Amino acid sequence: YNIPVIILAQYLSAIFILAPEKRALDIVLDFNLFILVFASSLAIASGYIINNFYDSKKDLINRPNKSMLDRLVSQKTKLNVYFTLNFIVALMALFVSWRVFLFFSSYIFFIWFYSHKIKKYPIIGNLTATLLAVLPFFAILLYYYTRIPFEDIENYKRQLGVIFSHATFLYLLLLIREMIKDLENLKGDLANDYKTIPIVYGEEISKKIITTLTILTVFPVYVL
């Protein structure tokens, strides 16, 4: 469900924060912006696929019903769809600008690296997963702020502050979700040697961290 949230966040940011001087309809009908938002959606979708590819054994334990559906799709098919989506994302990003292309190329690499290596480790796995969930939202900044002369950036500090406050709030919410998922997936993580926070530090510590993060969500809301 991150995909519709990111799409909505990108368009709302464009309409109310990044380009308030433009008509909402002009922003919605901006073809380059549509391509960028669509590329963000496909990049997130490809991330889900590669994550599912590496989690197939763990999901047999944690989500047996879901795994029954997954078995209808072979691992080879998942990889083929993953590479196809990434190729489409790269082409779409290049259509918008070379900066957007570099952004999404880096994002695709890091989401693979996370799924393959980082996610098995406590704390850094949670922080990275949450960062990768939020990161596509910032692609829209490349679209608007790379067009602004460097000397005029000072005039956009307030807009950037609002954007980063929203992003921080979203980051904390998604980090809480990742922590809760680790508690729910305890059996599968243990069986597959994942070093998550509940496994390494215990369930009680995990619950205390979740409570602390929930309290911290008040701060970005206060700033806004």
Regions found by a protein language model. Give the residues of each.
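Multi-pass alpha-helical membrane architecture of UbiA-family
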Residues: 1-224
